């Protein structure tokens, strides 16, 4: 008996070894952290590891799990109300070790006995089990399954019938190496080998109690579930809660398991000595056996030293066997043996004795578990580890669309969708009203310039912001050679166009701009040297004749690293085809030619020198567009600007003469500016005249998805775009910018016309993002003088005396408004002062127009000019670090319109305009009281500006110098304006100039959303006419005095004033009476720049000015009505792949969605456990034919498909393989004897036919052999007396009878027949007599019962064909006969006549599967169907089966068709076609005369099964036919390609990579020269228009908007 326990005890000795603990320590948490303890002890050793699944599966925190109090034991958890599942990564963060023990204390319920369910399961990421413990309730067993190393599953089954007795049990599963064991109630149930497994990875989910078929939770009670990472700890786990009587507190589990064996364990003492384990056996044994076993076990006991630290006695306690010998001794320990191999688990031990009952436990009934009183409440446990995530909640609402996943492996084709509904026919409605303006779209590419439009009528309204600048000046031509000066004459007629010049050299390479200058439009060229003044010309010349189209320019060198100029707007013409954007920086202005002298009119002499330029003539017609230049090459990058370089601000040079318009350049796109604060919304003005058409905007964002239209056929593939050579990337890092999309590729060729009706219009697209505000545009040209009515001439007022400037006093309260003083008389005009020193580098405004000279005489038309010389290479002006000059962005169109002539109500404060010309100087006011001390100035703002004082001086110097004012027009006096905003604390004069000019522009650039998206650049507006002179407001309260500024530049000498004695400052007087209007005074000296006045009323419409520069982006307008459906936008760049978010709760079930497109198939998962066979789904519609695939291996033959519809009768087929014997067809009516036809080619081998109807009665055959004697038939009625038979043979002589009495002698030899005598006694049977001759046949008797089958007789000889008998009634269908032997093939007959086309036969049964034919050509795509409704899960096997059947059917039909059309030999050319189907039965005809027997016809197609015929007479068996002569044919070749199939359903391919950037387009030709503008006014913003905003306002961290 001890031998059966030796392996178990040996395993017990191994439990102390944790050699794999080093490996599992990283995977398994310590037992203290998990709250694990062995049942019979209060704690585990420190290095025991495992998982408490009650905590990790959050069973205590799940409200759906019922908790039942259990006195003297843990809580009972009733599972089944909610699924118990958690992600594997939360339960086993590093996976499950290869060796482990799963321990559960559970009670199975009655209703679980009919199920198969998973007690424990860990799935992988695809939902396939990694490891599972399955309960098979039908077989009362457990099955452990795990993924094997080869991908298949390894499993082992344990019979555990005791689990199903509806009682509590302790189930322990240990997996150690390749052995798995199950223990139930601390007794070993069985051990099974387990194949090599894959390691369990921390992916997928962990389930507890899951129905394998329905996926629902299974109901059972649970007390304990945990996993030890040491499989041998199951031997230490006790069963006190299951077997209360057999669990004394001091005994270990091992002792309980072997109670009958009285196992005693001696643990090592603290000194580390290893003691043996003692064994007390039931039967007395020899001490030698004990010693041997003890020695063996002691070799294993050293492993216990690693765990146990308790002490025990040095010797074994006495054994308690009564019958044991007293001489059993313990041998000393032998030497330590080597480590043995792991043994197999031992056999199950005997059941232990019932343990002692607990003190407080009571069993209510024999079947009930023990109920124990509740013990004292334990101390609060340590905080548990982070529990796993809870169960999935109810289905949440549909989440947002996830990011696009990686493309999966190509899956099997999906079911084709159903045909879509026909699209609705849409009637185009009437044109709707014009909607409010939508959001400004992004800048489109520049089209070719259109011809200049006619000047429109002057509009009414406030002046708009300056429009876009024209193209930068192109290079001027070389100076012409000087001729002899001609005489001055009047302007000649235009000469003929010159000869086309030669192709110019390519422009130089442009360096890329460093970071920080990416927000600005193309750089203007450096100013050219001022040309020499020309002589005054009295009259303008006529416009020149249009020039000849120039040659194609040589390629410009591209700057591909310069990002596409999205903000540049060229001159707007009619929209041309979209070209790819060109790159290039504007060229420098050319040098002016030397002016020639205008000669008098003389004879035609030699060509004189070129005259100095006269005033420009009217614009000639636009020249022919030149050929497209070649693209530029990449540019070298500029060196990076250092941080300190931002202080270098290049001031613009003196203005050169206006060069000829150059081609429009493209600047760099700016960085995304922060949105400015939102300005006050102004009142809506009347609509202005339509402006010039803007350049086409780029495509907006895609609109909301409209209903799907019918898909057009795929267009041809576009040509591959040209690659772009990339430039070095921009220096520095660009922050807060997403990657820019690539340039749009060239427009593809027009695809073929789509088939089908157009779909419904889609919903409008989302509004585009607002672009960054542009820089303020350059000052527009002044409008013409207003048309106000001139007031009466005022009387000249007396000049006031200038007072001495007083010291600044404290600011007093504002005094009462004084009355307006009397108008002073005009002073005497002073003498002109000397010329002042030259101004700073900022160019002054143009002077007023000089007086018009007298008109000169008209010159004669000039000759056709000589062919021009080859132009110089174009220059790409690439400014150096110190010469950065920037022009402003185009302004938005003005929107305000005032009512004509009448001043409107005062609107909200508009954008401060540039200072107007100084008005007529007012009277000298009385000095005010001293103001309060000013607040500290904006030293922080100005201090941080990287502007040197000399720069400010040079920038602002000309702004404070006045100029001659244009005479203003008096209007009615306006009402007093509101009190102005308190002035900014004063700065020095130049800083005040700087701030007063730039702050409104900076604030104007601010919007409400400082962090908003950039708006799109608006289309340029036309410059509006100048406004009417505003009414003069009453004088506002004096502002606070600022700190003194630095001395300004020296102004020009003023007019000498009247000499007066300086008076003391007087007090403010009472307001005087209104004086009469004085005469117009002479212009006074230039005053200081005043504060910006209130917005005046709208001015009169001015003459249409030149197109200005692009202004800054306007405020965001009210959202316009939805526009018409836009074209689909280009795909945006793919965003970065986001991190996987946490698992959300399950949402509620959503509405039925539309059928999505087939997703990318995922990677093939491992095979799951076999599922139930699903019901076959309905076959989908016929799929489109896919592209030719690789020939796959021959598949297994599929089940025969349904018969197809009858096909068109094809021509005769080729010689096919020998067909199977067909079934006899129905007997047809006897036809007329046909001519003998030639032997046709053998048809396809048919299937065995049903038995035919009985044929006509044949000739009598030879008598067959006698059959075996049948059973006696039933006794028949006595038949009629037959005729007397022939006398039989005499019988044997009977015994002599008694002698009769002699009768009387007769007359003749024979007397009459006497009466019948009485029947004599039966005599003995006589011997058989000789056979008599056969009698006449008697009448047929009643048919007897069937006799037994006779033996098979020899075959009879072949009889002759009899004449065909009359058509018999159809007999009942006979039973299916056995297939006869194959007959020999007949000799080939001669060719028969070609028969007429027979009717279409009924569909035959599917033939055997032939070899696959070559794939046919792809068909043209059919109309796409409307997306089908969401179907069930696709059954791919069903689809494959259906497709296979259809292909086989099509193949058979086509094979027959094509083989019939192939070339035959001459003798086979007229083979009969396949037999047609039987016709309908006609009216019975008269019996025809028997025809001559025809040749055997072809075997007919399989007929329908006839009704059973009347049972025929048994025929004689015919002789066996001769063996056929034919040779079995080989398999035919594959048929020709089938017809073009319907279009297949392909899967949507993955998104292709983004195309390469297209080649930049060439710049457009220069627009026509505009009319010269009038002289402008001094605008301080001109001082800064050329400065980048980053240099004007360096970023500060504490400021928003453009300042930070």
Curated annotation (Swiss-Prot):
Q: Where in the cell is it found?
A: Secreted, Extracellular space, Extracellular matrix
The segment annotated Nonhelical region 10 (NC10) runs over 232-374
| Pfam families reported for this sequence | Collagen (PF01391)
Pinpoint the Collagen-like domain residues.
Answer: 375-423, 573-633, 667-721, 788-840, 888-938, 1018-1075, 1472-1524, 1528-1576
Positions of the region Triple-helical region 1 (COL1) with 2 imperfections? 1473-1578
Spell out the residue ranges making up region: Triple-helical region 8 (COL8) with 1 imperfection. 522-555
Q: Which GO terms describe its biological process?
A: cell adhesion; cell adhesion mediated by integrin; cellular response to amino acid stimulus; female pregnancy; integrin activation; integrin-mediated signaling pathway; positive regulation of focal adhesion assembly
Q: Where is the composition biased (Gly residues)?
A: 486-495, 1386-1395
Organ and tissue specificity: In papillary dermis, is a component of specialized fibrillin-1-containing microfibrils, whereas in territorial cartilage matrix, it is localized to a discrete population of thin, weakly banded collagen fibrils in association with other collagens (at protein level). In the placenta, where it is found in the amnion, a membranous tissue lining the amniotic cavity. Within the amnion, it is found in an acellular, relatively dense layer of a complex network of reticular fibers. Also located to a fibroblast layer beneath this dense layer. Exists in tissues in association with other types of collagen.
Quote the biased-composition stretches of kind Low complexity, using this chain's numbering.
383-397, 686-702, 766-781, 792-808, 826-846, 1271-1284, 1369-1378, 1420-1429
In residue numbers, the region (Nonhelical region 1 (NC1)) covers: 1579-1604
Sequence segments annotated as region (Nonhelical region 9 (NC9)): 507-521
Outline the segment boundaries, as ranges, of region: Nonhelical region 6 (NC6).
Answer: 724-738
- What domain notes does the record hold? This sequence defines eighteen different domains, nine triple-helical domains (COL9 to COL1) and ten non-triple-helical domains (NC10 to NC1). The numerous interruptions in the triple helix may make this molecule either elastic or flexible.
Tell me its family. Belongs to the fibril-associated collagens with interrupted helices (FACIT) family.
Tell me, what does this protein do in biology?
Answer: Involved in mediating cell attachment and inducing integrin-mediated cellular reactions, such as cell spreading and alterations in cell morphology.
How the protein assembles, per its UniProt entry?
A: Homotrimer. Interacts with FBN1, fibronectin and integrins ITGA1/ITGB1 and ITGA2/ITGB1. Integrin ITGA1/ITGB1 binds to a unique site within COL16A1 located close to its C-terminal end between collagenous domains COL1-COL3.
The protein's name is Collagen alpha-1(XVI) chain
What organism does this protein naturally occur in? Answer: Homo sapiens
Q: Which gene encodes it?
A: COL16A1
